[in-house]
Amino acid sequence: MVNVSIARRYARALLDVASEAGRTDAVAEQLTAFADVIAKNAELTDVLVNPAYTREQRLRVVESVMQAIPGGVEATLANTLRLLVDRNRLGYLADIARLFRDMADARAGRVRGHVTSAAPLPADALAQLQQTLQQLTQRNVLLETRVDPSLLGGVSAQVGSILYDGSIRTQLEEMRRELKQR
C-alpha cells in the first residue's frame, strides 16, 4: 500500500506553490488529466514505476505526456512532475492528484458530490439539486453525475460522507423490510 503521508506532502507543497501563483484550479485540472492518462495506460504506468527503466527514460515519458495534454501544463506542475521522476515518487501520482484536489476544494470551501439517477438528469433539475445540496451543506457543491438504471427511478446523492437517497429502489427495499417485520 502506498504511504499516503508522502503523497500528502507533495500535494500540499504543490498546492502552496499553485495558490501563490493563483493557478490552483488549473493545476488541479491538469494534474488530474495527467494522472488519468497514466492510470488508463498500463504500459505508461509500468515505465514510470518499474525500476528497470532509467530516470532519463521516465523523464522523457513524463515530458511526452505533459506535451500531449491539451494546452500543456503549468510550470509549477511540470516542475513537480520532474521532481517526482527525480525522487522515484511517480508511484504516488494518483494519490497526490486525489489529495491535491481534496485540499484545493477544502481551501476553496468546496465539496464534491456524486449524483446517481436512473436516467440522465436534465440540466435544470441538476442545477436545482445542486442548489438544494448547497443549502443543506452550507458549502459550494460540485456534482458529478452517473446513470444507474438499477435505481428504477429517483436520485441518490452523496456529498462528502452523507448520502441522500431518494431512489425508488431504496424505497422499495424499505417497504419490503417493513412488510417482513409484520
Swiss-Prot record:
It is found in: Cell inner membrane. Keywords: ATP synthesis, Cell inner membrane, Cell membrane, CF(1), Hydrogen ion transport, Ion transport, Membrane, Transport. Belongs to the ATPase delta chain family. The keyword Disulfide bond does not apply. GO terms for molecular function: proton-transporting ATP synthase activity, rotational mechanism. F(1)F(0) ATP synthase produces ATP from ADP in the presence of a proton or sodium gradient. F-type ATPases consist of two structural domains, F(1) containing the extramembraneous catalytic core and F(0) containing the membrane proton channel, linked together by a central stalk and a peripheral stalk. During catalysis, ATP synthesis in the catalytic domain of F(1) is coupled via a rotary mechanism of the central stalk subunits to proton translocation. The gene is atpH. It is a peripheral membrane protein. F-type ATPases have 2 components, F(1) - the catalytic core - and F(0) - the membrane proton channel. F(1) has five subunits: alpha(3), beta(3), gamma(1), delta(1), epsilon(1). F(0) has three main subunits: a(1), b(2) and c(10-14). The alpha and beta chains form an alternating ring which encloses part of the gamma chain. F(1) is attached to F(0) by a central stalk formed by the gamma and epsilon chains, while a peripheral stalk is formed by the delta and b chains. InterPro entries: ATP_synth_OSCP/delta_N_sf, ATPase_OSCP/dsu. It comes from Myxococcus xanthus (strain DK1622). Gene3D superfamilies: N-terminal domain of the delta subunit of the F1F0-ATP synthase. SUPFAM superfamilies: N-terminal domain of the delta subunit of the F1F0-ATP synthase. This is ATP synthase subunit delta.
